[in-house]
Amino acid sequence: MKLGEVIQRVQSLYSRDVQSDDSRLSSRHIYNKLLTVRTRLISQKSKQKQKINDWNYQTISCIEMIDIQPHECPCAPAVNCTVKRSRYMIPKVMTDYNNNLIDYVMTIDSGDKFDFTNKSEMLHINGNKYTASKRRYLIDNDYLFAYGKDVPQILQIRALFEDPIEAVKFTTLCSSEVNERCIDIFDMEFPMDGDTIDIAVQLTSEELIVLFKQNMEDVSNDTGDIPVINSKG
């Protein structure tokens, strides 16, 4: 379903319950709440070890990987092992128990996958001559780092990103500034499967309605606290 359609569905449900001249919400306001609900629903599935539908994932292809100095690496590469870093920060990936929800990082030509690793694991790996040169990746400070005997200049990543728009707008070797300016975000496919998106629309609308009513109560209470001054004349 297109993002514009999802936002419109939320707005329609919201407007039915909120009878006010101020009931029209901005698309950005709806989108931000929708992201919160989407992340919560997907995280719940992940924690319960349920399969996450492929529709929820996004793939960023043609990620430019650049050579960096050893002191720029979160983990020093082993002997005969090279390391490259993405030129730009990767859009934030959803996490589950401190693990990034990434399906894969792989080459775009041969489809060779890189294994996930972390800083502590790399310390043990570097001391093993049989596994030190194996292709691995990690995310550090939102950058993608790739280790291995031969790390290509271009990689692709498939993951559950917190903000789908940021994933679509990510600058790659396959994109251009002109193309980025021409993206109509409301026409992009919102990465959620059909069953879950219905739930997300309902929850997003309900939570926005609750916020509206809370704000109305706060305004009413503030008005009631204003002292009445009787003038004598």
Which role does the model predict for each range below?
Residues 1-233:
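Glycine-enriched, solvent-exposed interface loops adjoining structured elements
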